[in-house]
Amino acid sequence: KDALEHTGFAPKKDGEEHVEWNYN
């Protein structure tokens, strides 16, 4: 998966939801 697919979100893992690491 693209690591920068979601701005402000960590890359999606296999079957896991995106992790919010910088949403503020």
Swiss-Prot record:
Region (Disordered): 1-24
UniProt keywords, alphabetically: Calcium, Glycoprotein
Record function comment: Calcium-binding.
UniProt keyword annotation of Glycoprotein present: yes
Keyword Ribonucleoprotein: no
Superkingdom assignment: Eukaryota
GO MF, one example: calcium ion binding
Post-translational modification: Glycosylated.
Reported tissue expression: Nacreous and prismatic layers of the shell.
One of the GO biological process terms: shell calcification
Comment field (misc): On the 2D-gel the determined pI of this protein is: 5.6 and 6.7, its MW is: 50 kDa.
Protein name: Calcium-binding shell glycoprotein P50
